[in-house]
Amino acid sequence: MDFNSRRITSIIENALLEDRATSDATSYACIDPNQRASATILAKQDCILAGIGCIARILDVYAALDGAVTSHYEVTSHPEIFDGVRLHKGQSVAVIRHNARVLLSCERVILNFLQRMSGIATLTRKFVDAVSGTKARILDTRKTAPGLRVIDKYAVRCGGGQNHRLDLSDGVLIKNNHIALAGGIVPALERAVRNRRGSQPIEVEVRTLQELDEALAYGAEAILLDNMSPEDVRRAVERCTPLERRVPLECSGGIRLENVRAYADTGVDFISVGLLTHSPQAADMSMRVSPA
């Protein structure tokens, strides 16, 4: 990921502004303005790392916001430390040498990014490992934190998952409310084929095997099996197997670590998991600061 991109820079800037990082009353009152310090970021649990590139970018954006602070700093980490690597409890993520006030003012923002992203990556890796040996691929959803979607979805990739739609413009996914308003699966598909932009893929959500048959009869390009049991997903896979045209099947709804293997064993192509980004547990990390 390009942490210097305008989109990521905007996210980081908003986080620093939200925390009033350049107006840190405590650090201003307690710390000499010229003091240098060294900060070590530590993993306090085993986890999958995501977001190490945000450290330097946060310091750069802080300097731009503050205006009076020099941006001179040094961020070092072991060559084997990179996004997607498994960290062990007590392992050093990075060491930062910088102005002491800046380190303290940016501490929470740096940790917020690293902990959330690494938490998502860690949970994603658990799901990926759980379906290992099957054809199923783990997908994310649009159930992300407001304003942080590009960050959340990058973290999913760090954990070994794949991204579904980035936003509403990224392909056609006909869901139950579209079907209800269009008057049924077939009318919804007919309108989608007629009105889609270019060659955008069209996926349709079905909740029963009867709806699956309707979608297949019309020639749906991809099908989302919503809130079906593993048994019904297996039946859906069996119905699609003899078809001359391969129709990718995705299942979603109520997918947890406890049952994801049962879904993967059905032969389904994709399993989308909202849990990855709407309810991740932040990875436990800390920053220890000492005089340089």
Per-region residue spans from a language model:
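Cys/His-rich Zn2+-binding cysteine-cluster or related metal-binding knuckle/ribbon modules and their
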Residues: 257
